[in-house]
Amino acid sequence: MDSRLALATEEPIKKDSLKKYKILCVVLLALLVIVSLGLGLGLGLRKPEEQGSCRKKCFDSSHRGLEGCRCDSGCTGRGDCCWDFEDTCVKSTQIWTCNLFRCGENRLETALCSCADDCLQRKDCCADYKTVCQGESPWVTEACASSQEPQCPPGFDLPPVILFSMDGFRAEYLQTWSTLLPNINKLKTCGIHSKYMRAMYPTKTFPNHYTIVTGLYPESHGIIDNNMYDVHLNKNFSLSSVEKSNPAWWSGQPIWLTAMYQGLKAACYYWPGSDVAVNGSFPTIYRNYSNSVPYERRITTLLQWLDLPKADRPSFYTIYVEEPDSAGHSSGPVSAGVIKALQSVDNAFGMLMEGLKQRNLHNCVNIIVLADHGMDQTSCDRVEYMTDYFPKINFYMYQGPAPRIRTRNIPQDFFTFNSEEIVRNLSCRKPDQHFKPYLTPDLPKRLHYAKNVRIDKAHLMVDRQWLAFRSKGSSNCGGGTHGYNNEFKSMEAIFLAHGPSFIEKTVIEPFENIEVYNLLCDLLHIEPAPNNGTHGSLNHLLKTPFYKPSHAGELSTPADCGFTTPLPTDPLDCSCPALQNTPGLEEQANQRLNLSEGEVAATVKANLPFGRPRVMQKNGDHCLLYHRDYISGYGKAMKMPMWSSYTVLKPGDTSSLPPTVPDCLRADVRVAPSESQKCSFYLADKNITHGFLYPAIKGTNESRYDALITSNLVPMYKEFKKMWDYFHEVLLIKYAIERNGLNVVSGPIFDYNYDGHFDAPDEITQYVAGTDVPIPTHYFVVLTSCKDQTHTPDSCPGWLDVLPFIVPHRPTNIESCSENKTEDLWVEERFQAHAARVRDVELLTGLDFYQEKAQPVSQILQLKTYLPTFETII
């Protein structure tokens, strides 16, 4: 068939079909319009009463205004409920908010909260009643309030304090997701917030919550982990056991008891320890923990406590929510689950602020929102198994990101278990090993994690996002977790605060959560119990600080070590051929130790720009030894300097170290021989040699002899001295260039009982062989520079910057796996691992720094509690 013919015959058929389709569409459209108009007109003409709405008629048995339907409690059984009965009368009792349908409702006795007209008088309104039903603007949209005085209703003489914990809310969440969290973001905008708050190690829930309310390190308050064993109790503690309610585990004085002991009342809607009879007492009001109670119930109950009569009303409140921690564990920190959890806690916080505003308390209450720790991603591909290191596992291991190892056979073998062998067998086993084993006394001092029998001696510091397990399949490994090194950025927690006592619209520098307890006491105008915080270090958060700190008074003033003779009465088995082989040179060198008053003033100005360290030890017999390039505080009993101080300016382009002077040591003629070390002390001990506390890294060759004297000697393990020398010869110069000069204070530390405080003489257990010269457990170095680096440290008009280190003094460098490595590959990392606060140095040495710096004491305390960090990855 011809194709043109086929096309011609098909064309009329297509046109007929199209015409029918158009007609059908028009007819259907017309019918749709007619039906719509009919329904609209019919419903519009129907009277409102005939619709049978239950609005304002819920459970009313009179049936007034209802035709053909009912709103009483029996309508469901009869099947004659009005169309909106379920939404208006049933679901309204199951929500915590008002809506336009609920406003003015009949009082629903089973409702969670009320939107009835009399709810304000009855004090049972939903938190948003005034916003929804009376047209007030919500708290979240209002401008930031500003006032020097509390805006409190009658009966609130002291602003209440609310401590709100959001478990596992890491600081980065607030930066990343703040636009999704309108309520918390408003608090951040109007109040104060820190870049982060540092959790204590291990970064776990119970240890950190209890630290926040006691101001104590976990080693001090006893809750050293979520799981632990106490050999004296012979019991195990866990979050799922009844033992967690045994007061024997809980030491210290939580803030609710501090408040109660001083005449205030306290109420806790959950907080680790609040449902335990610590010291025999519970908070005034508390609830036994249950994670099934909705956040809205917790918020509503706290608001009801604020409604109590003045005589019964608490001054301090805690509230705790489990998110976003729970979502972080199950989904990991970067997940939709965490975002949803963050929004749920933001809604809960918004509900609290709406409820406070409804009571006119939103600018009266001092509220702190914080977290206990952060969260990090984990994976089953990033797990270290002990079965890869031991042929047979014959020990018990607390697994995860902060593992501890102890004997299985408890209590019999608890104290005889060979932790040293465990640590030795786990040290430097693989080039890509993702943990470092430590005996707890050797852990970085900034962790304060050693002095408690519940802290097992063998400990692993695990790399970020890695886990350590006993064997494969022994625990869950996916999702997220926490517990890691508290310097990891992923472990950083939030801190926000708002209220009449706090400054406004300010970002503050990071601080540690041990400081929160003292802050809470200041807000409540009460005296804190002894704690590990530094009282006054957070005064800059407050408009009018309650506590005014002052410098500590010196307990031992320096004695005189005067120059009496240019030649020693006893050479102390020392020799310096370069001086002694030429008549008069040794006497000439010793005369340099006899400084005039003007020379003393000049060296003090240059080398002690912030004042000499004060000695806080009783019977700390010492004297000051002045030199042109350094000054020492010489400890007579220990026969070595307690500290040396000197300033290293930024070197010029052509500067170099003075040449070394080999085999040269001489007696310091200013110190009695009986109070001096002999050069022969180090001949018998092959593992120990002498080091110089002041390393003579500046000045002329002539001034270098000022350092080669017995009063500058300190005992050092030979392997440690390699690291010490590299630090002073290379890193110190590097830091001086970076910071435009440094003031350096260094010295020995004795902490044989590893309690974080200086030892009494009878606690020191190791000495240079055959002598009474004690061997330090650590050495400290405090580097101070000017924050404004256009100034040098000896002429700094403003804030200072500090970089302190407390380095364990050990016979080997196995911590750094340094074998076959040059110092440039490991020394700086080793020092950074042992960075500390100035306050840590003070506690370990009995010294007190910066007393002559012209700055308010509270600002000096900020400096002393600052911890340098070197982590940049989250």
Swiss-Prot record:
Keyword Cell cycle attached: no
Binding of ATP, residues: 204, 226, 275, 289
Catalysed conversion reaction: a ribonucleoside 5'-triphosphate + H2O = a ribonucleoside 5'-phosphate + diphosphate + H(+); UDP-N-acetyl-alpha-D-glucosamine + H2O = N-acetyl-alpha-D-glucosamine 1-phosphate + UMP + 2 H(+); ATP + H2O = AMP + diphosphate + H(+); CTP + H2O = CMP + diphosphate + H(+)
UniProt-listed Enzyme Commission number(s): 3.1.4.1, 3.6.1.-, 3.6.1.9
SMART domains named among the record's database cross-references: Endonuclease_NS (SM00892), NUC (SM00477), SO (SM00201)
CDD domains, per the entry: Enpp (cd16018), NUC (cd00091)
Gene Ontology molecular functions: ATP binding; ATP diphosphatase activity; bis(5'-adenosyl)-pentaphosphatase activity; bis(5'-adenosyl)-triphosphatase activity; bis(5'-nucleosyl)-tetraphosphatase (asymmetrical) activity; calcium ion binding; GTP diphosphatase activity; nucleic acid binding
Binding annotation for Zn(2+) 2: 325, 329, 482
Keywords, alphabetical: ATP-binding, Calcium, Cell membrane, Disulfide bond, Glycoprotein, Hydrolase, Membrane, Metal-binding, Multifunctional enzyme, Nucleotide-binding, Repeat, Secreted, Signal-anchor, Transmembrane, Transmembrane helix, Zinc
Segments on the Extracellular side according to the record's topology features: 31-874
Chain segments carrying region Nuclease: 581-874
Induction summary: In bone marrow-derived mast cells and basophils, induced by activation of the high affinity immunoglobulin epsilon receptor 1 (Fc epsilon RI).
Post-translational modification: N-glycosylated. N-glycosylation is necessary for normal transport to the cell membrane, but is not the apical targeting signal.
Disruption phenotype: Mice appear healthy, and have normal numbers of peripheral lymphocytes, eosinophils and neutrophils. Basophil numbers are normal in bone marrow, but are markedly increased in peripheral blood and spleen. Likewise, mutant mice have an increased number of mast cells in the small and large intestine. Both mast cells and basophils show increased proliferation in response to extracellular ATP. Mutant mice display normal immediate reaction to allergens, but strongly increased chronic allergic inflammation in skin, intestine and lung that lead to severe tissue damage.
Positions of transmembrane segments: 12-30
Membrane topology: Single-pass type II membrane protein
Subcellular location: Cell membrane; Apical cell membrane; Secreted
Topological domain ranges for the Cytoplasmic compartment: 1-11
Functional description taken from the UniProt entry: Hydrolase that metabolizes extracellular nucleotides, including ATP, GTP, UTP and CTP. Limits mast cells and basophils response during inflammation and during the chronic phases of allergic responses by eliminating extracellular ATP, a signaling molecule activating these cells in an autocrine manner. Metabolizes extracellular ATP in the lumen of the small intestine, and thereby prevents ATP-induced apoptosis of intestinal plasmacytoid dendritic cells.
Protein name: Ectonucleotide pyrophosphatase/phosphodiesterase family member 3
Species per Swiss-Prot/TrEMBL record: Mus musculus
Classification lineage: Eukaryota, Metazoa, Chordata, Craniata, Vertebrata
This protein's encoding gene: Enpp3
